[in-house]
Design a protein with these regions (language model features):
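Bacterial Sec-dependent N-terminal signal peptides
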Residues: 1-29
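Asp-box/BNR beta-propeller loop motif
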Residues: 22-36, 59-79, 105-124, 153-172, ...
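Beta-strand-rich domains and repeat architectures in extracellular enzymes and scaffolds
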Residues: 33-59
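Short glycine-/Asp-/Thr-/Trp-enriched loop segments that recur within the blades
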Residues: 36, 80-84, 124-129, 172-182, ...
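Repeated scaffold domains used in trafficking and secretory/extracellular systems
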Residues: 41-43, 84-89, 126-133, 229-234, ...
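Entry beta-strands of beta-propeller and related beta-repeat scaffolds
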Residues: 51-53, 95-98, 138-142, 194-196, ...
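Short, solvent-exposed loop/turn segments at conserved positions within beta-propeller repeat blades
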Residues: 103-104, 146-150, 200-202, 252-256
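Blade-level signature of beta-propeller repeat domains, shared across WD40, Kelch, NHL, RCC1
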Residues: 327-347
Length: 347
């Protein structure tokens, strides 16, 4: 009995003495930059340190499989006349590649090695799709600005073979002037079957579904809202409860008032953080993997900022302008911007 008690005591002491994760202090970073001529890139999918896919303007779809040493870039054209401007890109768990264009007509491509197939097309004077993601191998979602009095949301449940637009009677109503921002393909966040979408304009709100996008709730936020290009540009969730939203006013990028907030209850309520402090306007925010929700990067045309306390305080680590960032592990991330891709390697 004494031996058993001793073993239990040793195990408890060992467990309690395990080193807790200590967030890093990062004051500057180095990014390896790859020039991409004649395309502005707001949508990327990073597989690992070596493999990345991007979708950009002027129909550009690009890939690297050797960490950026070489690139394969193709440019798509519809009916030999329409050049799609891509701002949405998604990969399902079976590695199906999908790219969605903004503007009229909206063109959603399934892109293979030797062919490109349009699996969804929508024509409307107001059509404008902003971002797209997959939950898993079968279920996917894309969101766009209202063509009626509700957001445009299309869903797939067959690996992207077919897409269906939800009717307005199944969606929350939008205020006049409320829409989404196609800035970084990150105004959607997904954890398991739950999806959150962030809006801006006259209202800055969070839409939430816990059933692959079939039914919806909507919540208010204290993020700046009103006239013009202000609101939430990007969201990310570390788990089903803890998330962060960031944005601001694109027309006043140096303002840092009411442009970042966190939630601890799955998006129902939001609290402003770092009020009247950096960072200012940002188009993308992402948690660093395996850092217990403490380390966060935010990027935009105003530079790159880092937080090691869950978003409460920030440090500007670079003035380089980028639209979006995506981590593949605790130390490696890919970024994209105007005519460039970046690769960040942390120590």
């Amino acid at each position: 009995m004494k031996r058993i008690l001793l073993l239990i005591l040793v195990a408890l002491i060992s467990f309690s003495c395990k080193k807790k994760y200590q967030p890093r202090t990062i004051e500057s970073i180095k990014i390896t930059e790859f020039k991409m001529d004649s395309t502005s890139i707001r949508a990327i999918h990073a597989f690992n340190k070596n493999k990345l896919v991007f979708a950009g303007s002027k129909g550009a779809i690009g890939t690297t499989e050797d960490g950026g040493k070489s690139w394969n870039i193709k440019r798509l054209k519809h009916n030999d006349s329409i050049i799609p401007n891509f701002r949405s890109l998604a990969i399902n768990e079976n590695n199906g590649l999908f790219a969605l264009s903004i503007g009229n007509p909206a063109l959603l491509y399934n892109i293979g090695l030797n062919k490109e197939e349009i699996v969804y097309k929508e024509e409307h004077e107001k059509v404008f799709y902003d971002s797209m993601h997959f939950f898993d191998a079968e279920h996917g979602i894309a969101v766009g600005d209202p063509t009626d009095d509700c957001p445009s949301i299309i869903l797939t449940s067959d690996e992207g073979k077919t897409w269906t637009k939800l009717p307005c009677n199944q969606l929350p109503k939008f205020e006049e002037g409320e829409a989404f921002f196609a800035a970084s393909n990150t105004n959607i966040a997904i954890v398991n079957k739950t999806v959150w979408i962030a809006s801006g304009g006259t209202k800055a709100r969070i839409l939430k579904s816990t059933d692959y996008g079939k039914s919806w709730e909507i919540y208010n936020t204290p993020i700046i809202q009103g006239d013009g290009p202000q609101g939430i540009y990007s969201i990310d969730f570390y788990d089903e409860n803890n998330g962060i939203a960031i944005g601001g006013n694109y027309a006043k990028p140096n303002d840092n008032c009411a442009n970042k907030a966190i939630t601890k209850d799955g998006g129902k309520t939001w609290t402003l953080v770092a009020e009247n402090q950096s960072p200012n306007y940002k188009s993308c925010v992402q948690y660093v993997p395996n850092t217990n929700g403490k380390e966060i990067f935010a990027v935009g045309k105003t530079g790159i900022s880092f937080s090691n306390d869950g978003g409460n305080s920030w440090t500007e680590v670079s003035k380089d302008p980028y639209y979006t960032i995506q981590f593949v592990d605790q130390n490696t991330a890919w970024l994209s911007g105007h005519e460039k891709i970046g690769k960040l390697s942390l120590p």
